[in-house]
Amino acid sequence: MKQTGAIIFWLMAMTSSHAQDPGFSQFFSSPLTINPALTANINGKWRVISNYRNQWSGPGNPYSTGTISYDRKIFQNVDGNYVDENTRVGIGGMMMYDESTGGALKSNYASFNATANIRLMKKEGYEQNGARIRHIDKANNEEGSEQRLGVGLGLSYGHRRLDLNKLNFGEQFTGTGFDTNLPTGETALSEMKPYLSASAGLVYSYSKNNIHIDLGVATFHINTPNQTFIKDENQYLARRYVIHGNLETFLSDRIILTTNGVYQNQAGASYFSIGGVMGYYLAGNEVVGDVILNAGLWYWSDNAVIPYLGISYGNFQVGLSYDITTSTLNEAAKRANTFELCLILRGRGKASGVIPAPWK
């Protein structure tokens, strides 16, 4: 669907300010966009994640974002144990696309992360179960604990493009309509110079009995690369600062509680999200693994509440969420529908933590 010529002025205004990163309501299902130190923090040997977000579905489909990522542990034995449990090493990569204005403005990203997770302290009596599922050896874990620190570094490549074929300009107006075959005179706007961006993060982890906690901080775009359709060195991609945390615990032999939250700040804009999910163990065996039903709810700043429903079947997981808008944005959009779909596939192996979280 062709847009009106006024769209170009909106695009110019948008790129004249510091651009912001696309994000997901299911931030917990997109760990590589939250903290590079979360790379290879997996309940398994490796992990593939695919996220899709469609915001305000309807005529023109204003916003659409998708990712696919792969991360894994390295320097492991055949059984999935690290050669050196005192230092765990992992790598990962991600590709992302983001479209807005009915697909006229397109952004593509690729990133690579590396992480090292170092044991700070291990109290005798603590023994990691190694399974992704609910079973705990209380005799070994009752008095034990472990503390670890993860350090992650990342490098990303970004490129934005304006598809002029999906826009109409004043030069194309014939008096009775728009002739898209006519020149626009705006070819200089179609391409933005690619950029490289650096990121870094830390994650502190604490495990004891049937409780696991992660606390992390990260900074993206440390080098603040230039990003604009016009030649203006003052327009750059602002640093994004992230603080996040999560807690997992067993409430019973069949019920797992996971809570988490995130705070992000970029270019003077900040937002937070907090919530949790309850997992119910349905069934499982050595062949197919565990079947766990997950249901939860998150609160996103003053903008939306986000119900979530998912299921884990062995090493495969699917999660679906829907943003229920609570702000005045709901009045501005005729169909303020925003949904996200996440698919996760894990390779069997030793878990990074004692307790299964639905996104690890």
PLM segments and residue spans:
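Sec-dependent N-terminal signal peptides
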Residues: 4-15
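Positively charged n-region of N-terminal signal peptides that target proteins for export
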Residues: 1-5, 122
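Subset of outer-membrane beta-barrel
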Residues: 20-360
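Absolute protein N-terminus
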Residues: 1, 19-20
